[in-house]
A protein has these predicted regions:
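Arginine residue identity/basic-tract feature
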Residues: 13, 26-27, 84, 144, ...
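Catalytic core of the metallo-beta-lactamase
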Residues: 28-127
Length: 168
């Protein structure tokens, strides 16, 4: 239910198709395709498993392109961070992050925002002795100095460095 402003204009101008979680059907303007948790969504030349991952919003979903080992996590999981909780609960966010942790470690993670450097600084405050995190920060700083995005990350890197995925 986040980032839906402009749906009507995009549909009108480009003929876009609006896709969203079935539970948000009344909240998302102009929704065309309703998706459910664990559904395999096939369109054109791809298929993705839909994962309902509430926490940031109650209807947040991610798209797991399992054959390619790519997941789009939107605003639930960021590189070295996680999203703010707007509608959900901390328990829901924790469960959603644990759901993502079950994917193969070599899964590439594409998140909704490039907050990696700030997230790295936050992680370092609480996990300063983590050697993997120190290496990751060096890599991030070099990438950002050269104007290169830090995304995608991998689940393996996140499991080693992201304090929110390391929480128990």
């Amino acid at each position: 239910y986040d980032h839906i402003g402009g749906n009507q204009e995009l549909k009108k101008k480009y003929g876009s198709v609006v896709v969203g979680f079935k539970g948000d059907s009344r909240r998302i303007p102009e929704i065309d395709i309703l998706l459910e948790d664990n559904q395999i969504w096939k369109a054109e030349n791809f298929e993705a498993k839909i994962m309902h991952i509430p926490g940031h919003t109650s209807g947040h979903i991610c798209f797991n392109f399992f054959k390619e080992k790519i997941v789009f996590t939107g605003d639930t999981l960021f590189s070295l961070g996680c999203g703010r909780i707007f509608e959900g609960s901390y328990e829901e966010m924790f469960e959603s992050l644990n759901k993502i942790k079950l994917l193969p470690e070599d899964t590439k993670i594409y998140c909704g925002h490039e907050y990696t450097l700030n997230n790295a600084k936050f992680c370092k405050k609480y996990d300063s002795k983590n050697k993997d995190l120190q290496k990751k920060i060096e890599k991030i700083e070099k990438l950002r100095e050269n104007g290169i995005p830090t995304i995608p990350s991998t689940l393996k890197e996140e499991l080693e460095c992201n304090i929110f995925l390391r929480a128990k």
